[in-house]
Structure formats: structure tokens, C-alpha cells
């Protein structure tokens, strides 16, 4: 995958607003990366995904939640904070999306909740820079803010919320690694059908191997 070529193709566009960023982020960055690195998961990228536990992401891909902003929005700390935590008490940010997208059940024990939340990743993008956010294990217990999501986590958990800002090219390389992942895909009807279907490269290769083995025997 030629990362530099992806960068050049993306930057050829004119970005008048946030919607332009969203459109070309998918068409010029995410889609080519998935076709090259993870084609069987191409239809797992969902734009404006409404999460069951609250919030509507600009997009999701498996355990990754995206928050896309207008060009150069992350040039100021205020823009980064908005991507992370939302504009106000009613607006969601990556912090909320990671929790909401974790698939937490009301009967989950603390250790299960921790594992689920730590699998989540938040990615912000403003056409210039990337913001990568996640929860990591912490020796200190902290109470999570779930005021914006439709679930309640009563107990403080051994988790810390961290983020880092990366320039375009190193951020794009990090994104490529994240999109390549498959081991963190939730095992459910939706994700299974996205991999196991007649047009899937995985299915075609598997059938061919079975056919070859049957011929030999």
C-alpha cells in the first residue's frame, strides 16, 4: 500500500466543510485501505452509525469509532477536545463512543467491562491531523463519565482515557494498521455474514481448497 499516494490523492480535493472531509475520507482513504488490507470487511465501515447505548458516530468500523471535523479543526486545543468529549453536555465525543460501542451488558462484571472498553478505539480526523483515543489499564480506579450514554457503570474501574495527535502521514500509517485488524471483530450474525458470503474471497478460496482435497482423495 502506497501511503504517500493515498495522501496525495486525498489532498487534491477541496474541503469546503465537514461533509467534504467525510466523503473523501471514505472514498480516498478508508475504502482503498480496506480493499488492499481487509477486503472481506469492506462493508463493515458504516457511516453515521447510531449506537445502541447512545450517540451517532460519523462512522464505525468494527471496534473503531470515527469523529470527522472540518479541515484544520485540530489546529487548536479546543477542536481536539471537542472531538474527544463533544461540544457540550448533549454532544458526544470519542470518549462516549468508545464506551457506547463496547457492547457492555447490564450483568457484565467489572473485569469484563474493562476488557470490552479497552478493545475500543476512537479516531478523529480533520483533513490534516489524526487523533487516536482509547482507554488503557490503570493501577488507579477511576469513575467513568456515562452521563451521555444509555448505560450506567456504577463502580470505579482501573481505566485511564488517553489520546495522541499525529500528523497526516504517521496517522495514516496507524489507521492502516487498525483497519487491517480482524481478530477484534465481534462474533455475531452481522459480522459473520460480512465475511461468509458467495462473493467473499475467503469463501472462494476455501471452496477451492476443499475441491482440490476431494479430487486428491
Segments (PLM) and residue ranges:
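A short, conserved, highly charged catalytic patch centered on acidic carboxylates
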Residues: 1-121, 129-216
Amino acid at each position: 500500500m502506497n501511503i504517500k499516494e493515498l495522501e496525495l490523492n486525498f489532498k487534491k480535493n477541496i474541503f469546503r466543510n465537514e461533509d467534504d472531509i467525510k466523503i473523501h475520507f471514505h472514498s480516498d482513504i478508508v475504502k482503498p485501505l480496506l480493499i488492499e488490507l481487509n477486503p472481506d470487511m469492506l462493508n463493515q465501515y458504516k457511516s453515521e452509525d447510531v449506537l445502541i447505548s447512545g450517540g451517532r458516530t460519523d462512522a464505525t468500523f468494527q471496534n473503531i469509532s470515527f469523529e470527522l471535523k472540518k479541515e484544520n479543526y485540530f489546529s487548536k486545543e479546543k477542536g481536539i477536545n471537542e472531538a474527544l468529549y463533544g461540544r457540550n453536555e448533549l454532544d458526544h465525543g470519542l470518549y462516549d463512543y468508545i464506551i457506547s460501542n463496547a457492547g457492555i451488558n447490564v450483568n457484565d462484571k467489572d473485569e469484563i467491562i474493562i476488557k470490552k472498553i479497552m478493545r475500543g478505539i476512537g479516531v478523529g480526523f480533520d483533513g490534516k491531523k489524526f487523533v487516536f483515543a482509547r482507554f488503557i489499564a490503570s493501577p488507579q480506579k477511576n469513575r467513568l463519565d456515562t452521563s451521555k450514554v444509555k448505560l450506567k457503570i456504577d463502580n470505579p474501574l482501573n481505566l485511564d482515557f488517553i489520546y495522541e495527535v499525529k500528523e497526516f502521514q504517521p496517522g495514516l500509517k496507524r489507521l492502516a494498521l487498525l483497519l487491517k485488524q480482524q481478530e477484534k471483530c465481534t462474533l455475531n450474525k452481522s459480522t459473520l455474514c460480512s465475511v461468509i458470503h458467495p462473493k467473499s474471497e475467503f469463501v472462494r478460496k476455501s471452496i477451492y481448497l476443499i475441491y482440490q482435497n476431494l479430487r486428491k482423495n
